UniProtKB/Swiss-Prot annotation:
CDD domains: BBI
Residue ranges the record assigns to the propeptide: 29-42
Chain's role: Inhibitor of trypsin and of chymotrypsin. May function as a natural phytochemical defense against predators.
Leader sequence segment: 1-28
Cited Pfam families: Bowman-Birk_leg (PF00228)
UniProt-annotated site: Reactive bond for trypsin, residues: 58-59
Name the UniProt record assigns to this protein: Seed trypsin/chymotrypsin inhibitor TI5-72
Phylogenetic lineage: Eukaryota, Viridiplantae, Streptophyta, Embryophyta, Tracheophyta
Keyword Signal carried by entry: yes
């Protein structure tokens, strides 16, 4: 009889554990304030943003995108996508009506047709 009570208690404990785990469901959304994004953050300084290779359409107004690939995106990038590699290869997918100033002395700006 005591063995039967232990089985019932174990089942009850397992059920309570699973219910408590299910009640605290993990939120699978991307949280931009998570620890890892704070560690890898480029900052929010738009004034220091730069881009060596900016592609723009010939539309009026133009739609421009920085296509630099590096270990991080420029500081004003909102949509930075990084490959899972070492070192990381990151590219910004934001579009603007302008290009940021060049990061280096040789400014390269290419214009593509819309």
């Amino acid at each position: 009889m005591e063995l039967m009570n232990k089985k019932v208690m174990m089942k009850l404990a397992l059920m309570v554990f699973l219910l408590s785990f299910a009640a605290n469901v993990v939120n699978a959304r991307f949280d931009s304030t998570s620890f890892i994004t704070q560690v890898l953050s480029n900052g929010d300084d738009v004034k220091s943003a730069c881009c060596d290779t900016c592609l723009c359409t010939k539309s009026d107004p133009p739609t421009c995108r920085c296509v630099d690939v590096g270990e991080t995106c420029h500081s004003a990038c909102d949509s930075c996508i990084c490959a899972l590699s070492y070192p990381p290869q990151c590219q910004c997918f934001d579009t603007h009506k302008f290009c940021y100033k060049a990061c280096h002395n040789s400014e390269v700006e290419e214009v593509i047709k819309n």
